[in-house]
């Protein structure tokens, strides 16, 4: 059916046996790694002969376990680029009655991430390297939308996981460009900088062949040949800025927490007394607090947004203390410019 309609057939198959069945049935794309055993040479040959594209999706399975166990790494990419509200829900469990949690979540919270994930990760890495070495078409994909794997922010994390399989940065860039285009049959239009192809281009400040994180250094975007400045694309609302600040606070990430504030930030108490001014004073005020209070968690009990002001009723767990208060955040030009704490 898909072939008759000139469509690619992508199949979810994570076991060697089901992957074999899928390819024999005409699958053009395997959208997950084979993770139950090392792929034998005859199947590697079959994948290459049939021009099957392999998308490893290395991080998605473990991200479920990280979320359910509460062992979130709070990767910088997530704190900076994931949907701020969606990411914030991952820590909602901290404010819940743990006795009411589903049994599966209780198990993860008690036992942590099972060791079998280590074996799965190892098998996936070995298979990925074997296929790349054999010349099988490998493309980047994250399966974003699953629990703990977010659109946009999961991309660099997937590349970092692929890098652990001993792939070169050039391998990773090919997987994200021309290989993906080949896999979906659109390499005549996109995937490489060639005459006659659509001019969809990222211009970077730093060389991604030196580090995949340099893909974050986007200077300009060209879409269909039209230049787009980055700062015209991502203009977060005041509420989004404050939510991203909250996520960094709950992650106890001092750098990304401070990054949501303007350099001349002023923080006042309810009587108008200036408590802190500027990033340096904020860092001095919060760094040790973040480091030492390992159970830190701020729950927003209520929120009101009025133009550029975000008013949060906050409940903070800090060690053995529970602190209640109201914070008024004033946002200008995408940064928190002023904070007033109300008793």
Spans of features found by a protein language model:
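Divalent metal-binding pocket/active-site signature
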Residues: 1-28, 36
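Active-site neighborhoods of metal-dependent hydrolases
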Residues: 39-165, 231
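Divalent metal-coordination and catalytic microenvironments
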Residues: 2, 12, 30, 54, ...
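A cross-family glycoside hydrolase active-site/sugar-binding cleft signature
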Residues: 10-12, 31-33, 55-58, 141-143, ...
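Structural recognition of alpha->loop->beta junctions
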Residues: 20-41, 158-171
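A beta-strand edge to alpha-helix "cap/lid" segment located at domain peripheries
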Residues: 247-250, 268, 273-274, 281-343
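Short, well-ordered alpha-helical segments enriched in acidic and aromatic residues
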Residues: 251-268
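Acidic, glycine-enriched loop/beta-strand segments at the rims
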Residues: 150, 168-173, 182-218
């Amino acid at each position: 059916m898909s072939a008759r309609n000139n469509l690619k057939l992508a199949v979810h198959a994570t076991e060697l046996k089901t992957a074999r069945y899928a390819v024999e049935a005409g699958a053009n794309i395997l959208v997950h790694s084979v993770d139950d055993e090392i792929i034998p040479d005859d199947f590697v040959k079959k994948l290459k002969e049939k021009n099957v594209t392999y998308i490893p999706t290395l991080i998605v399975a473990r991200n479920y376990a990280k979320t359910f166990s509460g062992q979130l790494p709070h990767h910088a990419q997530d704190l900076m680029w994931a949907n701020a509200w969606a990411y914030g829900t991952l820590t909602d469990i901290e404010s819940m009655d743990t006795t009411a949690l589903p049994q599966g979540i209780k198990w993860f919270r008690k036992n942590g991430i099972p060791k079998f994930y280590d074996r799965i990760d190892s098998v996936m890495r070995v298979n990925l390297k074997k296929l790349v070495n054999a010349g099988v078409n490998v493309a980047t994909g994250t399966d974003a939308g699953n629990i703990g794997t977010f659109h946009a922010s999961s991309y660099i994390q997937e590349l970092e996981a692929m890098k652990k399989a001993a792939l070169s940065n050039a391998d990773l860039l090919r997987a994200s460009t021309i290989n993906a285009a080949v896999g979906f049959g659109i390499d005549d239009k996109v995937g490489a900088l060639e005459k006659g192809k659509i001019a969809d281009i990222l211009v970077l400040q730093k060389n991604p062949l030196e580090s995949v994180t340099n893909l974050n250094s986007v200077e300009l975007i060209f879409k269909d040949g039209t230049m787009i400045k980055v700062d015209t694309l991502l203009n977060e609302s005041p509420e989004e800025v404050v939510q991203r600040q909250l996520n960094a606070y709950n992650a106890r990430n001092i750098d990304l927490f401070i990054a949501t504030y303007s350099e001349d930030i002023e923080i006042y108490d309810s009587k108008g007394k200036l408590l802190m001014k500027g990033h340096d004073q904020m860092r001095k005020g919060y760094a040790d607090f973040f480091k030492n209070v390992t159970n830190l968690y701020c729950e927003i009990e209520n929120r009101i947004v009025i133009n550029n002001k975000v008013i949060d009723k906050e409940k903070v767990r800090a060690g053995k203390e529970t602190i209640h208060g109201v914070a008024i955040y004033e946002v200008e030009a995408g940064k928190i410019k002023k904070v007033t704490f109300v008793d």
